[in-house]
A protein has these predicted regions:
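An N-terminal-biased, well-structured beta-alpha scaffold segment characteristic
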Residues: 2-120
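Hydrophobic beta-strand scaffold residues
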Residues: 40, 62, 127-129, 221
Length: 223
């Protein structure tokens, strides 16, 4: 089935505060140029960080209907009511730890949602690939996909910006207003936080991302 047409679908995120996307226009353009048997359809979204027209320029199709997609990509948890039976989905479902709550009476809305999501996935014969579980099978099971580093970078940037505000100093542009990391580094490097004492805990991706940003902010690491 070498020449079989494979259709990829890109979801419009269910959360109104989510602007990220699993595939950028540049990535879609690359995929379509490399694989002649590939078709990509994208749900329209006003919240996404890229405009619908940016996807149209790549050759992708814009449509609400993803029923023809073989594989559907998202970022965060999907609206359960929109799940299409017999499909393969990839997104951060955060359902890995739900098993420990099976049989328990749960009031936490987030856990209730995840349990309902898994029930619907099973009911509709869906193959769910959670980005969180794409790991190296050796050693400590290193996660290949995660937002930790950038969460740390942006968290540190926003915290320093809040510090400026609380001390009645001129604030920097919000992180959401800056469209690339190089610009973030350029802006923060012009500030002087050398008298600020910061305690940073943890050793994961988020903390390493925060340390990375603080170096550009002229904050000296002492331990």
């Amino acid at each position: 089935m070498k020449n079989k047409i494979i259709t990829l679908g890109v979801l419009a995120e269910a959360r109104i505060d989510e602007s990220r996307t699993p595939l950028s226009p540049a990535q879609i353009s690359y995929l379509l140029s490399k694989y002649s048997n590939l078709k990509i359809i994208v749900q329209p979204s006003k919240e996404r960080c890229f405009k619908d027209k940016d996807y149209l320029k790549t050759g992708a199709q814009i449509t609400d209907n993803l029923s023809s997609a073989d594989i559907i990509f998202g970022v965060k948890e999907v609206d359960i009511s929109t799940l299409i039976k017999d499909k393969t989905y990839l997104f951060f479902s955060h359902t890995s730890k739900v098993r420990q709550h099976i049989g328990q009476v749960i009031k936490d809305k987030a856990i209730i949602y995840k349990k309902e999501l898994l029930k619907e996935v099973i009911k509709k014969n869906i193959t769910l690939i959670d980005y969180e579980n794409i790991r190296d099978t050796s050693g400590e099971g290193y996660r290949y996909l995660g937002f930790g580093r950038f969460a740390g970078i942006i968290g540190a940037y926003n915290t320093l910006n809040l510090y400026l505000k609380l001390n009645n100093k001129q604030q920097l542009p919000g992180a959401f207003e800056i469209n690339n990391y190089e610009q973030v580094k350029k802006i923060i490097s012009k500030q002087n936080f050398n008298k600020l004492k910061i305690l940073l805990t943890g050793s994961g991706r988020a903390s390493k991302g925060a340390i990375e940003l603080l170096k550009y902010a002229n904050v000296r690491q002492v331990s």
